[in-house]
Amino acid sequence: IIICILSIFLIIICIVVYGVYQKNENTAQIGVDNKTYESYENKEVLGTDIISIINKATDSNKKNDIKIGEDGNYIDNGKNSIRIEIKFLELDKVITMERINNVGIEKFWSNYGALSFKCTKIEYHEKTHRVKYMYFEEV
């Protein structure tokens, strides 16, 4: 009976240790992912860099099976979705990454690839602390 109790206790300890390990791994991965996005914050970057970050965010949303709303934009799922918006000097409205993808990355590259932009805002999901939103402005 003591062996049985010790076995159960050992199994419980293994489960707890594995859970803590998984949590630490997840936290480390969030840090790595966030660092990539945060490297753009308050820095001047070219339109070609915007293309790279849009592609990364789009790939992440697809990998995480983020739904697309009726307006054609990804829906915030409160966990791991990400949105990017860009404000151009000559336009009154903000353009979403989905719109740029729909019009064509190549067209964006040829028209805006050499222009400078600055990430002026980053927001995070409350529960997971992952980057959920980035706002770039043409400078």
Named regions from a protein language model:
Residues 14-139:
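N-terminal export/assembly leader peptides and their processing motifs that target proteins to secretory
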Residues 3-16:
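Hydrophobic membrane-insertion alpha-helices, especially the h-region
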